[in-house]
Structure formats: C-alpha cells, structure tokens
Amino acid sequence: MGLLGTVAMASHQVALQLAALTFMIPVGVAQATSVVVGQAVGRGEPEAARRAVGAGLVTVTAFMTVTAVTFIAVPVPLARIFSNDQMVVAAAAALLPIAGVFQIFDGLQVASAGALRGVADTRVPMLLNLVGFWLIGLPVSALLGFKLGAGPRGIWWGLAVGIGVVAVLLLWRVRQRFLRSIQRLVIDSTQT
C-alpha cells in the first residue's frame, strides 16, 4: 500500500484499524468456541460440540452483519474519528464499504478456525489459509491494485476475495468434520 502514496497508506490504516477493532469480538468468540468444542469432545458429547459450533457461527455472523451495515452506511463519520484530513477521510470512506463486505466472511473464517482448533484440526486450516490468502487473495490484490490500476480499493477487493475464499473453505472443513462422527481425542494414552 505504501507504493501508492501517503494518503493511500493513511486511509488504509484508518480502515484497517476499524476492521481490526470489530474483528476482536469474533476472535473472542472463536477462542470460546474452541474451548467449548474441545470440552464437549473430551466429555464424549458430539452434539454439544456441534451446538457450540453453531452458536459461535451464528454469534459472529450476527455481530459482523451489524458492523458490515455500519461500515457501508456511515463510512465518512467513521473515518473522521481517525483523521480530519479530507483526502484521507474520503479515501478511507471508499475502503470501508469493502471492509463491510468482508466483515461477515472474516467472522466466519475465524469462528470456523476456532471450532476446528477445538477438535485439534489445525494443519488443514493452515493449508486452507495459505491457499485463500497467499495463493488467491494476494495475487488478486496485486492484480487489481497495481496491474489494473484500481489502487487501494483494488487491494482491498483482493483482500475481500481472499477472506471470502478462506471462509468458504473453512466452513466446508467444519461441515466435513462436524457432520461425521466426532471421536474423543486421546492426547496421552499412558494416563489412567
């Protein structure tokens, strides 16, 4: 983003701060989901694990829908919280609706990752993140932002594509893992 100038960088930081602020709630929900899923699996209660996953996904979807609507509906007042420079405010206000678009996907991807962590499924989610962010999102950002000249908005649309792909892939993995039999994990078989 720095290659596009100081206004682009400043507006990116404004939008990123707002997106990061709202992302903290889904991160907390993901952590809670991970713990509750792990406890349910440890107790041998797969239905409780499935309910925890559902509750986590519904919670983040509801919260991020509210933030998405806010980012889309009032981007200028939100940008003004961080800057009084009109060029920065205008540029950030152009990025916030894109952040609004990916808010729901961002919540879903982090909650899905938390649910999968609760059943000790970390390798596949890591690979899915690699595919979505690095092999799809980053090239799309570079293509749109630099090659096609869309600038910061293009970079953010690429980020949105990457987040969307990761969310879909992780939701697929959650469905795959939680619709079948969930086995209790044996961490140390030497304990009695």
Where are these regions (language model features)?
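Helix-terminus/linker motif at the lipid-water interface of multi-pass membrane proteins
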Residues: 1-21, 39, 77-86, 147
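Small-residue-rich hydrophobic transmembrane alpha-helices
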Residues: 11-75, 107-125
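Short runs within selected transmembrane alpha-helices of multi-pass transporters and secretion channels
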Residues: 27-30, 99-118, 124-134, 140, ...
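Short alpha-helical transmembrane segments in multi-pass integral membrane proteins
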Residues: 37-102, 144-192
